[in-house]
A protein has these predicted regions:
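Short helix/strand-capping turn motifs
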Residues: 2-101
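C-terminal charged interaction modules
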Residues: 93-116
Length: 116
């Protein structure tokens, strides 16, 4: 569901706000996402497919960035095997369920505390 600049996905364990790269939600190959968890914390992740990474490296070979495309890096990177928000949401479901999101995603807002 589109909400301004963001594409929203709601699941029982999280709400994800995707800032999509180039392309529609069905075929986008990279996106930044804020994941709002049920404990009140918010984590940040970046999704890429391998072809999207290859395009970045090719552009960097041409531009001379990163020593002519010698490497690629992105903070909080999750590589997915296929494009689309649906594939990203499936990955998020597993990351949240397994608690791997705590290691993978940067914490940008901590758990909300109830001070009574």
């Amino acid at each position: 569901m589109q909400n301004g600049s963001y594409y929203m996905v709601e699941r029982p364990a999280f709400t994800a706000r995707f800032l999509l790269g180039n392309g529609p939600p069905e075929s986008v190959q990279d996106a930044d996402v804020h994941v709002h968890l049920t404990d009140g914390s918010v984590r940040y992740l970046t999704f890429f497919t391998l072809p999207a990474i290859e395009r970045v490296l090719q552009r960097q070979r041409t531009s001379g960035e990163t020593a002519g495309g010698a490497y690629f890096w992105s903070t909080d990177l999750v590589i997915i095997p296929e494009p689309g928000v649906a594939a990203m949401a499936r990955a998020l479901e597993e990351l949240v369920q397994s608690k791997d999101i705590e290691a993978v995603g940067q914490l940008i807002r901590g758990e909300l505390q109830n001070d009574g």
